[in-house]
Amino acid sequence: MAKLRQRLACLLCAVTATLAGPALASEQGFPFARELMLDVAPMRGSKRVPIIEIAENGAAVIQLWCASTRGQASIDQDSITIVADQVPPTQCDPERQTRDDSLLAALTQVTNWRRQGEVVEFQGATKLRFRLMTN
């Protein structure tokens, strides 16, 4: 009887581990098709904060401080490269334009990424920290 209980306990542990494995992996895998919001305060006079969304095929939508553009991302285990399309002309104040240019340059220089729960960090010349949108 004790051996039967022990076997059932082992079986229960194995089933639980099997079911929990994919959930844990998805918690640490790249969050494709999810909006990633830059972990910074909005600029004075605005509520807008930059957001990037990368589809599983690598298509990227990049919303900067003022302008928006598209691009292509290549993601593999812990490496990432982002190539952004040209930003269409927009009417922005000089401070927002400068911040757009700086952020876009930082995005195109990222080389690695890592995820810890709801936080995704892009690492390169400048570390960029994003939070998963949970709305």
Mark where each language-model region is.
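Lipid interaction determinants
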Residues: 2-5, 10, 18-135
